[in-house]
Amino acid sequence: MITIEQLLDILKKDHNFREVLDADGYHYHYQGLSFERLSYDSRQVDGKTLFFAKGATFKADYLKEAITNGLQLYISEVDYELGIPVVLVTDIKKAMSLIAMAFYGNPQEKLKLLAFTGTKGKTTAAYFAYHMLKESYKPAMFSTMNTTLDGKTFFKSQLTTPESLDLFAMMAECVTNGMTHLIMEVSSQAYLVDRVYGLTFDVGVFLNISPDHIGPIEHPTFEDYFYHKRLLMENSRAVVINSGMDHFSFLADQVADQEHMFYGPLSDNQITTSQAFSFEAKGQLAGHYDIQLIGHFNQENAMAAGLACLRLGASLADIQKGIAKTRVPGRMEVLTMTNHAKVFVDYAHNGDSLEKLLSVVEEHQTGKLMLILGAPGNKGESRRADFGRVIHQHPNLTVILTADDPNFEDPEDISQEIASHIARPVEIISDREQAIQKAMSLCQGAKDAVIIAGKGADAYQIVKGQQVAYAGDLAIAKHYL
């Protein structure tokens, strides 16, 4: 429960309070109301709900519906003049985060918080950290793919970083379930829309940066994207940063006055020898590590997670065991066909991650290589040119372009746009299952491979704003082995 007096105090301390307006006019103080629930969904309110009117598409009709269900007061940046009191604020999203934090009893103070950001690798690093901490503690995890609030039951995540009301409700459930740590992926979008406003992490990890999520509904420029990624560093007590990433010197200067650990080529924490399924490290994580995920970048993700978990209480033995146990659904999953050709299923969904995926596969498969790829509709439009550029740099690759969450766009048009950046013929098969079947039928022996990129473990396609059932890349590939 939270009282009107408490929530006004929170807003005033954050300099986010304008006034309360009701039939009697303007009020700086207000009394007599308390709330047992928080909501931003007008269909889920009653007389004891504190409602947040948020979003560019919010309509007064939503409030009218809520009022018929008993709503007594709402918080908004706009007075909709509907006859009930309104708490007017300068920034509704910041208000949501701080009020949710207090409403749920400040659960962030009862958990050790670890956050990962980066253009790629967040989910893999989060899974590494989860398995490391699970050796001696009780970690919960909010990842792009799956969420667990009790370390036992996993469910599909809706957002990389949940909306603030959901985030703190889920954190509170983690505390109730006896969890000791929480591992999160924190997207640049989470900072852009203030989902984690006011939250301080015990350790923040910056894995890498490359152009992505740049478009009309995301970040207008790379500078804006990079800036919002860096906000995790400002909001973490200690940081772990990849010294091999672009713009590392800038980040090193930024974190010079806070506790920090670096890993990678310009640091003391390095991988000294690397095999397909093992590596040796020096520095704070010195030792031998077995790993199920192939690729040097996955070994670096393991190093990043290991350094973070070391600070959060994990032992070197915990870290070694955790790395050895980690598998990630939809990340570098490998199948073998009856003719011994390989099928790689991976979530690679931007130019940089695609380049790394192709490079890893080319190290191990020297025959005919076929790539199945698409790009999502109505977001991340810059990826399409990036995909074309990467494919152009791999001239021996046979490419079939297909659908990948086309949303409100025509998948054929998206494929044609990608193809326009490739200086050689490619095939377009918009039906993703048919594209996979065609590519697999072209494999002849153990040196050949099919690379299915983009969707990973997703068992749906986003079409016209809806999740449409899709068997999933891995299930389809297994069917045609």
From Swiss-Prot:
Q: What EC number(s) does its UniProt record assign?
A: 6.3.2.7
Q: Look up the signal peptide feature and give its range.
A: none
Q: Where, by residue number, does UDP-N-acetyl-alpha-D-muramoyl-L-alanyl-D-glutamate bind?
A: 42, 158, 160-161, 187, 195
Q: Which GO terms describe its biological process?
A: cell division; cell wall organization; peptidoglycan biosynthetic process; regulation of cell shape
Q: Name one GO cellular component term.
A: cytoplasm
Q: Which reaction does it catalyse?
A: UDP-N-acetyl-alpha-D-muramoyl-L-alanyl-D-glutamate + L-lysine + ATP = UDP-N-acetyl-alpha-D-muramoyl-L-alanyl-gamma-D-glutamyl-L-lysine + ADP + phosphate + H(+)
GO MF terms listed in the record are: ATP binding; magnesium ion binding; UDP-N-acetylmuramoyl-L-alanyl-D-glutamate-L-lysine ligase activity
The protein's PTM annotation reads: Carboxylation is probably crucial for Mg(2+) binding and, consequently, for the gamma-phosphate positioning of ATP.
The UniProt entry, under InterPro entries, shows: Mur-like_cat_sf, Mur_ligase_C, Mur_ligase_C_dom_sf, Mur_ligase_cen, MurE/MurF_N, UDP-N-AcMur-Glu-dNH2Pim_ligase
Q: Which UniProt keywords apply?
A: ATP-binding, Cell cycle, Cell division, Cell shape, Cell wall biogenesis/degradation, Cytoplasm, Ligase, Nucleotide-binding, Peptidoglycan synthesis
Residues involved in ATP binding: 118-124
Q: Does the keyword Cell wall biogenesis/degradation apply?
A: yes
Give the subcellular location: Cytoplasm
Q: Which HAMAP family match?
A: MurE
Outline what the protein does: Catalyzes the addition of L-lysine to the nucleotide precursor UDP-N-acetylmuramoyl-L-alanyl-D-glutamate (UMAG) in the biosynthesis of bacterial cell-wall peptidoglycan.
Q: Which family does it belong to?
A: Belongs to the MurCDEF family. MurE subfamily.
Q: What is this protein called?
A: UDP-N-acetylmuramoyl-L-alanyl-D-glutamate--L-lysine ligase
Source organism per UniProt: Streptococcus pyogenes serotype M5 (strain Manfredo)
Which lineage ranks, top first, belong to the organism behind this chain? Bacteria, Bacillati, Bacillota, Bacilli, Lactobacillales
Gene (UniProt):
murE
